């Protein structure tokens, strides 16, 4: 995401130091957002969509992708039996 269109800061844990500092920055600046709970599907979504989505769209799609990537494989396999 180009700085002219916005900045997305990703942090690992909500409430951790990186998240808290990023949030303070985002609250003071225009077109800066922070998401936490980063996982690999979220990063892949970010890299593939950062040139085609607005900052708000990117935040929403990254969060949705991260949540969709959380699974319990054993439960899924047991349900398929």
Q: What does each model-found stretch correspond to?
A:
Residues 1-81:
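N-terminal loops that bind phosphate or other acidic moieties
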């Amino acid at each position: 995401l180009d700085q002219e269109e916005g900045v997305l800061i990703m942090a690992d844990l909500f409430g951790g130091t990186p998240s808290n500092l990023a949030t303070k920055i985002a609250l003071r600046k225009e077109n800066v957002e922070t998401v936490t709970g980063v996982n690999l599907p979220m990063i892949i979504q970010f890299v593939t969509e950062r040139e085609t989505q607005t900052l708000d769209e990117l935040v929403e799609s990254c969060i949705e992708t991260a949540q969709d990537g959380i699974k319990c494989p054993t439960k899924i396999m047991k349900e398929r039996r």
